[in-house]
Amino acid sequence: MEENNYVIFKKQYGNIKRPRVKELSINLNGVKIYEKEQSMIINIIVPVEDSTKTIQYFEEFNLGEDIQFNIAGTGDFECSFRGISPVIDKNSYSSFSITVQEKEPQDQMKG
């Protein structure tokens, strides 16, 4: 898998002693990101055979839970999960959107 062709979503779980990360990679061609005032809408299109595992991955997030994503190896965006839209199934693909809110960098929050 060529990292530069994918968006990698990351979910942290476990505890401080045993932190774990669950990742999901989606081809860049199937991801479109739109910025709104205080959030981002991420439209996702995946082949129908990948839709179940992809949707299940995002359904595991709770409202406000941390989510990270890395676009083509450019570094992690730290966000809070805000929700998932209904899924639209077509013949060969499924599409849906997730909403995330970018987190404030720690040093900006203090000052």
Locate predicted features.
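Short intrinsically disordered terminal tails
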Residues: M1, K110-G111
